[in-house]
Amino acid sequence: MAQHTVYFPDAFLTQMREAMPSTLSFDDFLAACQRPLRRSIRVNTLKISVADFLQLTAPYGWTLTPIPWCEEGFWIERDDEDALPLGSTAEHLSGLFYIQEASSMLPVAALFADGNAPQRVMDVAAAPGSKTTQIAARMNNEGAILANEFSASRVKVLHANISRCGISNVALTHFDGRVFGAAVPEMFDAILLDAPCSGEGVVRKDPDALKNWSPESNQEIAATQRELIDSAFHALRPGGTLVYSTCTLNREENEAVCLWLKETYPDAVEFLPLGDLFPGANKALTEEGFLHVFPQIYDCEGFFVARLRKTQAIPVLPAPKYKVGNFPFSPVKDREAGQIRQAAAGVGLNWDGNLRLWQRDKELWLFPVGIEALIGKVRFSRLGIKLAETHNKGYRWQHEAVIALASPDNVNAFELTPQEAEEWYRGRDVYPQAAPVADDVLVTFQHQPIGLAKRIGSRLKNSYPRELVRDGKLFTGNA
């Protein structure tokens, strides 16, 4: 791989020399930072098994190298990246994989280590969604996830990725993460705080990442991180697991934040060592049991991960002063819910007891049961999945429900050719050589649901959402 020139402030280099263990070479650190980052992907096991994904992509000539800490993660090398971006492949468009940096798969691996099986999880700083979607896959779409994002512009991206990956057990919120300790005390079995940070570990992806770096800004960021971890710790139930992570390398934003929490609540914080998380984890292990990943250790981004347990309750915070407002949804009565479920099954949409039907005017929604305890405590940006809109002739089923709930083996499923699937993703109607019999058609490609269509004569009317329509070269190579 070609070198690229990274900007390093002198004070940063001094700080890294002091922070780096004697077992590591500073020259190796500098050399690793100058190398471009290896691409990596994570197979979305909600949609496809790793074995089936490897079989499906075998003809493409991709070189996939397993990532030690994530069974479904792979470093990827491919010859046609310039000709066809990874995000324009059919497998990405249908949610079979997520483009995710290898080291950012570590926090979720830590969250579920040692057989941990939380039922209600919070991702405090969730956008663009790599870790939320990874958590959902580990939970197999069961239980409930509260995915929060402070940046309003990033909430939309977060929802798009959750929808593409077929996730149904997520509620989205848009808050400063510092509110949750007071708003939802002791409500979560597990919390991931991938904290905003100075980004010192991302120079391989962004050579100018340190242009605005200063020791003073590190201290300001660390102060915010302490407030965030304190809030998250209050929201965690006794016995629950908190994973704290950053993509930065200084101790101030990493070890010091976790040690501050332990000093603040000495009887309630237990550090859970990560030395056995995966073979070779001990190479990045700190004396506290955290993973401090310098980029040369595993040839990835710089990263930090700590795992801790809340061993006992701590004093609650004063209740927040903001008003949540009225919740505009009401549960659907059992008899009507049965009729809706039957109609949905007719087009291949099915769900289990983890989801419950709610209604707002003519809209039908499915909410994860595990999130209901939070209703009235926080205001949701989006909750669960929109199933349908009712109208005089029945139901207008929604695209995100199809992606999350449809079975490709449904009697109304119709498999497209590669050329037809590409037309579908471009938002165009499809004219198959042999038209399906049913009027409501579950459109599939590679045996994956990609939408619903109305058959009008020999034409399949496209219902792919306008905001998802793709231009440019797609997977058949045609522009």
From Swiss-Prot:
Q: Which Gene3D superfamilies match?
A: 3.10.450.720, Vaccinia Virus protein VP39
Catalytic activity of the protein: cytidine(1407) in 16S rRNA + S-adenosyl-L-methionine = 5-methylcytidine(1407) in 16S rRNA + S-adenosyl-L-homocysteine + H(+)
What EC identifiers does the entry list? 2.1.1.178
Q: GO CC terms for this protein?
A: cytoplasm
| Keyword RNA-binding among record annotations | yes
Query: What's this protein's family per the entry?
Result: Belongs to the class I-like SAM-binding methyltransferase superfamily. RsmB/NOP family.
Q: Specify the protein name.
A: Ribosomal RNA small subunit methyltransferase F
